[in-house]
């Protein structure tokens, strides 16, 4: 499921992640999927 996200879904994940500085840093290094799941658990889509 995680491989088939739409751009809209990815953008909403980024907005959540960017509110958390540590998540944002991880997103820059490892990508939004890895960062979101590390901080917030499974992606809800």
UniProtKB/Swiss-Prot annotation:
Q: Where, by tissue, is this protein expressed? A: Also found in smaller quantities in dentin.
Q: Which residues bind Ca(2+) 3?
A: 18, 24
Q: Which residues carry this modification: 4-carboxyglutamate?
A: 11, 15, 18
Q: Which residues bind Ca(2+) 1?
A: 11
Disulfide bridge partners, by residue number: 17-23
- TM annotation in the entry: none
Query: Cellular component terms, GO, for this chain's entry?
Result: extracellular region
Predominant subcellular localization, coarse grouping:
secreted
Keywords annotated in UniProt: Biomineralization, Calcium, Disulfide bond, Gamma-carboxyglutamic acid, Hormone, Metal-binding, Secreted
Which residues of this UniProt protein bind Ca(2+) 2?
15, 18
What processes does the entry annotate via GO biological process terms? biomineral tissue development; bone development; cellular response to insulin stimulus; glucose homeostasis; negative regulation of bone development; osteoblast differentiation; regulation of cellular response to insulin stimulus; response to vitamin K
**GO MF annotation, one:** calcium ion binding
PTM text:
Gamma-carboxyglutamate residues are formed by vitamin K dependent carboxylation by GGCX. These residues are essential for the binding of calcium.
Q: Where in the cell is it found?
A: Secreted
Gla domain segment(s):
1-41
**Hey, what's the signal peptide range on this chain?**
none
Q: Which family does it belong to?
A: Belongs to the osteocalcin/matrix Gla protein family.
Give the function comment from the record: The carboxylated form is one of the main organic components of the bone matrix, which constitutes 1-2% of the total bone protein. The carboxylated form binds strongly to apatite and calcium.
Query: Which named protein is this?
Result: Osteocalcin
Q: From which source organism is this entry?
A: Lepomis macrochirus (Bluegill)
**Gene encoding it?**
bglap
């Amino acid at each position: 499921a995680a491989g088939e996200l739409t751009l809209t879904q990815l953008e909403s994940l980024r907005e959540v992640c960017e509110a958390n500085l540590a998540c944002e840093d991880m997103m820059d290094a490892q990508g939004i999927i890895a960062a979101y799941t590390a901080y917030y658990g499974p992606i809800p889509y």
